[in-house]
Amino acid sequence: MWEAAARRWLESKGLRFIAANVRERGGEIDLIMRDGKTTVFVEVRYRRSAQFGGAAASVTWSKQHKLLQTARLWLARHNGSFDTVDCRFDVLAFTGNDVEWFKDAFNDRS
């Protein structure tokens, strides 16, 4: 449900959809989008309230590591790598009725 809402929201901001719920060994990427020539790996989070830090705070270092690994595998399957493909990792956080878009929230150099 939240991935579909995130996709619509990001498309309204000009991003183009590539894939959803991409599973590779050890992880899953909620959305893969294109922003111009940049491949964007999107983690979608929802929390009812900002108590305990809200949605964005739930993307831990461990989760970031899994997303990086999953993206690395996906890129390899599509003849790419972090060295050859312009990409970034965004977090789209739904907290109650608020939407926050954290562009380039983390990267493979973090």
From Swiss-Prot:
Q: What CDD domains does the database record attribute to this sequence? A: PoNe_Nuclease
Q: Name one GO molecular function term.
A: nucleic acid binding
Which InterPro entries does the entry mention?
A: Restrct_endonuc-II-like (IPR011335), tRNA_endonuc-like_dom_sf (IPR011856), UPF0102_YraN-like (IPR003509)
- What organism is listed for this UniProt entry? Citrobacter koseri (strain ATCC BAA-895 / CDC 4225-83 / SGSC4696)
UniProt-listed Gene3D superfamilies: 3.40.1350.10
Membership in a protein family: Belongs to the UPF0102 family.
Q: Which Pfam families match?
A: UPF0102
Q: What is this protein called?
A: UPF0102 protein CKO_04542
The record ties this protein, via NCBIfam families, to: PRK12497.1-3, YraN family protein
